[in-house]
Structure formats: C-alpha cells, structure tokens
Amino acid sequence: MKPHDQFAKNYLEQLLSPLGTVEISKEVSDETRQIDLFFSPNPESNPDYLGLLGRIVLNTVLIEPYRNPPNRSEIRNCLAKLLTILAELQRQAKRENQSYNEDNAPRLWILSPSASLTLVESLGAKLDPDWPEGVYFLPSLYRTAIIAINQLPVTAETLWLRLLGRGKTQNQAVRELLELPQGNAFRENVLELLISWRVSMEINNILETEDREVFMTLSQTYQEWKEATKREGRQEGKLEGKLESIPRLLALGLSVEQIAQALDLDLEQVRQAIQETP
C-alpha cells in the first residue's frame, strides 16, 4: 500500500472512529474489490465538530480518497463498488421481509485533490447551492459526489478535508492544524499521523516537490517528535525506548522493515516486540 493511501485511511479512521463503525478496505462480494473506507454512524453521534467531513458522515457512506485526481475508469470502479453494496442491501432486505428505504441507502464520496472541468462535465456532476464550492454531485440516481479539495473554501469547516489535499492546499491546512490549541486531541493525533507519513516517505525515498513544502511546515514538529523519542529512549534505556515506540509506529501504518530502518533495529527485534505486544 502506498504511504499516502495508508495515511489517508488511518487519518479518516482516527477522525471517524468516535462517531461510529469504520471498516478499512472492506471487500465487496462480486469480485476482489475493496472499499477504502466504509462508515456507519452511531445513532447518538454528533459529528458537527468535523465541519464538512462531519456533514458527509451523518449517514452510512463509502469514502474513496485519492492522492492523484482519479480518471473516469477509476471513478467507474468506485461506482461499481457502491452499486454492489446497494444490491447486497436490497437482497438482505428482501430475505428479511423488510422494506428497502432508498433515502437511507449509503452514499459514495470521492475525495480528489482536484477535478478538471472536463471530468466534472463528463460525469454530469453539478454544484449544489446548499453545499460549499468544490462539492460536485452526480445525478441523484448514482448517490455519489466528488469533492475537489483544492476548490473548497479555506474555512475551519473544511480543514479536516483539506488536510487530504496536495501541495499548497495541504500545506495551508497543516499550518491551520498547527495553530489549533495544543490540548486539542485531534491536533496531536493527526500530527502524529502526518509525521509517520513523512518518515515513511523519507524511508522509501519518494518525496515529491510539493510534499517537501508540506514537510518543511512540519519540520519543527518533526524535530520536536524526534527529540521526544530520544528523551524517551534516554529515560527508559536506549533499546527499551525504541521497543516501546514500535506498537505506535505499527499502528500508524509503517511496515516492519520501515520501523526497523527508522529505529535502527534488526528485523527480528521488531518482530519479537510486536509478538510481545498485548
């Protein structure tokens, strides 16, 4: 899995888990396909604090985040996943002798860093006056919308989606994230995910120019994280400190090989630490 794909899934799971059930890489039955993220909200959840993202997840949704703008073939593949899920729900309702409520059926949200006018027009997608700029809805039959992240207004309401953008869009969002109060739980958790993404990109030597701009914004936080890791190692013993950090890095999506390289450990040391984790 590409570093950004892992980051996007972990990031959305971090934000949405308090609100309902999150399934990452959910398989659909017609063939070997996986939905990036399938979310079912808890009835009592109140996602208002997530702004536009919270509005999206008021009901059951499929979310497909893209690092690069999807082409028409990729969008058709997303639609196929949605149609498969809808067909499964219809069959389930029939088996259980229940009515199938189309209004409560899942929706598909495609998150793209940008969307060309040609693509939008080819999809028959339109802006909705009740939604911000950059949110394009396909004809209602398809229960699908595509969000051009770079077109979203720069407001607090869109912050959590703009963090999944690219280049200047993402860099601006990271700056806003850093300005949040340090006691903000999401601030700390998301920064940790961003730092993990940076480590993974550096290890794989796949930093792009626009990524470097974002990582420059994160540089001070990254240095603070490294210093904290060193202090932790000194306080608990150098090796013990490294071993303590393995479960956290694993949870953030780094592979065994990446963790070993980042912490300067043998692969066997990392594997053993993972096995001993409760």
Regions found by a protein language model. Give the residues of each.
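Short, charged alpha-helical interaction segments and adjacent helix-coil junctions
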Residues: 63, 147, 164-278
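Conserved single-residue anchors adjacent to enzymatic active/cofactor-binding motifs
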Residues: 1-206
